[in-house]
């Protein structure tokens, strides 16, 4: 088996609004959308600097729904950018909720975390140093040992 691509495909309650948010917060560009006669968006694609994010409105009749407010989500979308502080600020200004301010992390990245208005969690980071897996494990173990 050969995997050619892997896409995140998010379900949101209002895809049109999500497209506007992702454009404002992350500079995403709409590639296409498929709209039902009712106005519900069955599929949309956004370009994030060469990476595609897929979106669709909820289809509860098929068990397809987005995260519920206050219920959390088991998935975090990680976006690697040039300046995490700037992008976190843009996301919050666009309507995201700040979950964690950007800070330098043991794994060689400066990163922060936001939750978008549709319940999806985004980790936003940029590289600050190259860290080998062995050094990363050492730092992780050391960090966990601190009270």
Label each PLM-derived region with a short phrase.
Residues 12-16:
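Short acidic-aromatic low-complexity motifs
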Residues 118:
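C-terminal catalytic core of tyrosine-transesterase DNA break-rejoin enzymes
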Residues 1-9, 20, 26-115, 125-147:
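Vicinal oxygen chelate
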């Amino acid at each position: 088996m050969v995997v050619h691509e892997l896409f995140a495909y998010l379900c949101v309650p209002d895809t049109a609004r999500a497209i506007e948010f992702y454009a404002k917060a992350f500079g995403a560009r709409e590639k296409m959308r498929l709209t039902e006669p009712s106005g519900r968006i069955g599929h949309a694609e956004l370009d994030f600097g060469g990476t595609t994010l897929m979106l669709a409105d909820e289809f509860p009749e098929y068990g397809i729904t987005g995260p519920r407010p206050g219920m959390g989500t088991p998935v975090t979308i990680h976006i690697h950018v040039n300046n995490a502080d700037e992008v976190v600020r843009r996301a919050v200004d666009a309507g995201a909720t700040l979950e964690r301010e950007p800070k330098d992390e043991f794994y060689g990245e400066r990163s922060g975390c936001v939750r978008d208005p549709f319940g999806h969690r985004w980790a936003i980071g940029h590289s600050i140093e190259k860290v080998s897996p062995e050094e990363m494990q050492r730092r992780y173990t050391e960090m966990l040992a601190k009270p």
